[in-house]
Amino acid sequence: MASMLLAQRLACSFQHSYRLLVPGSRHISQAAAKVDVEFDYDGPLMKTEVPGPRSQELMKQLNIIQNAEAVHFFCNYEESRGNYLVDVDGNRMLDLYSQISSVPIGYSHPALLKLIQQPQNASMFVNRPALGILPPENFVEKLRQSLLSVAPKGMSQLITMACGSCSNENALKTIFMWYRSKERGQRGFSQEELETCMINQAPGCPDYSILSFMGAFHGRTMGCLATTHSKAIHKIDIPSFDWPIAPFPRLKYPLEEFVKENQQEEARCLEEVEDLIVKYRKKKKTVAGIIVEPIQSEGGDNHASDDFFRKLRDIARKHGCAFLVDEVQTGGGCTGKFWAHEHWGLDDPADVMTFSKKMMTGGFFHKEEFRPNAPYRIFNTWLGDPSKNLLLAEVINIIKREDLLNNAAHAGKALLTGLLDLQARYPQFISRVRGRGTFCSFDTPDDSIRNKLILIARNKGVVLGGCGDKSIRFRPTLVFRDHHAHLFLNIFSDILADFK
């Protein structure tokens, strides 16, 4: 079986390389030296349009129970492997979106399947404890093997959560408690504070604020939603807070041609940040913290320079604001470093950092001074899931053993180079190509063309994602290799050549 599979892959690789050399070929990508992911498929295999008939039937059934309009198609996860997602109609697609950037090392990784089959791990998957009061014996050990082994600089404290929204929500609460504790000093809670907090009034509920950026996405819970400014549909009809919103830089591309303009744009945004901090202090809505993504993701894959973030960090420190870096989507290795903020080169990059998605669990790291001063202040029933810490420990081992951070940088370079070639060939469809590692994207002329390209690509066997008003984003797994990039680029080149 193994030898037959290897032969099939070699044949596929030969055919793939051969067609790139055919005179007059409109494919732009060069064949890469193929480094196989052992549990991967050879390529896409399409049997129906997507969604196919089985998916459509299941969508109808689900729509009876809930609004299912967001569902793209139903999946067969038993058959999905590596970089390939298989749907219930038997269509096999190269997945460059990976469950909204949340699959770290591919579908059905053999090491993870082996892990869950080991008898000593069974109880961890069957029994989900309330970690805040009844953690299992090996909880600390597993945290050390998983999350604490990749802790950011200067952050020794860790609280686990279940998802990105609850990670950010509780991180915001932690910041507010830290700030009020600074103001309160050594004294305990006053009777007035204890009474007024119960009726949502000051001084028990101080009127602090969090500064966020236009285009940001930090989650859908109430506090997070007040800092989210990417799509109106996320926020409409929901009461919110009067918190400051700063502009995020809108860089011009190619970067090397617009150095001065981009520096001026970043300076403008930083000046506005400082102005808002002062303005809200005068309004008696003191800015307790600043929250920012290293790359704005849902809002359109908006980048800023490393220098912008270094200066933003300085502003937070100058004004006594906590600095919260949201690594929910950028964390876990996709930019070529485990945490995207590592690219900034700071010894003190943040006070608090949130994570989820590729980390398989949620939570946040923070400095010692942000540690809650009493139990139950940051708390919920589960506080994450220890089975996810078990899986994450193995994921981190694989990332290190297979050098997947360097792979993300290398494969990302292949992808970005190919996208730039496509941009040169089809400037009427592709602009503002940008990326860090495999965390790449480009703009289309409008959302109609963007959505049409995503649908065509899906029916050709490639899953892509949209973001912002008109961008297409790439969020492949960490086992995405150069040859996957070239495979996609050839498929997408065909699509653009025929696009009308």
From Swiss-Prot:
Residues at which [2Fe-2S] cluster binds: 163, 166
Expression across tissues: Liver > pancreas > brain > kidney > heart > placenta.
UniProt KW keywords: Acetylation, Aminotransferase, Disease variant, Disulfide bond, Iron, Iron-sulfur, Metal-binding, Mitochondrion, Neurotransmitter degradation, Pyridoxal phosphate, Transferase, Transit peptide
Binding-site residues, pyridoxal 5'-phosphate: 164-165, 381
Transit peptide: 1-28
The protein's required cofactors: pyridoxal 5'-phosphate; [2Fe-2S] cluster
Residues modified to N6-succinyllysine: 231, 252, 413
Catalytic activity: 4-aminobutanoate + 2-oxoglutarate = succinate semialdehyde + L-glutamate; (S)-3-amino-2-methylpropanoate + 2-oxoglutarate = 2-methyl-3-oxopropanoate + L-glutamate
Principal EC category: transferase
Binding residues annotated for substrate, in chain numbering: 220
BP term (GO), one: positive regulation of insulin secretion
Pfam name, any one: Aminotran_3
Modified residues (N6-acetyllysine): 252, 279, 318, 413, 452, 470
EC number(s) from the headed UniProt entry: 2.6.1.19, 2.6.1.22
Cofactor note: Binds 1 [2Fe-2S] cluster per homodimer.
GO molecular function: (S)-3-amino-2-methylpropionate transaminase activity; 4-aminobutyrate:2-oxoglutarate transaminase activity; identical protein binding; iron-sulfur cluster binding; metal ion binding; pyridoxal phosphate binding; succinate-semialdehyde dehydrogenase binding
Subcellular location(s) of the protein: Mitochondrion matrix
InterPro entries registered for this protein in UniProt: 4NH2But_aminotransferase_euk, Aminotrans_3, Aminotrans_3_PPA_site, PyrdxlP-dep_Trfase, PyrdxlP-dep_Trfase_major, PyrdxlP-dep_Trfase_small
Gene Ontology cellular-component terms listed: 4-aminobutyrate transaminase complex; mitochondrial matrix; mitochondrion
The protein's assembly and partners: Homodimer; disulfide-linked.
Role of this protein: Catalyzes the conversion of gamma-aminobutyrate and L-beta-aminoisobutyrate to succinate semialdehyde and methylmalonate semialdehyde, respectively. Can also convert delta-aminovalerate and beta-alanine.
PANTHER family in the cross-refs: 4-AMINOBUTYRATE AMINOTRANSFERASE, MITOCHONDRIAL (PTHR43206:SF1), AMINOTRANSFERASE (PTHR43206)
Name of the protein: 4-aminobutyrate aminotransferase, mitochondrial
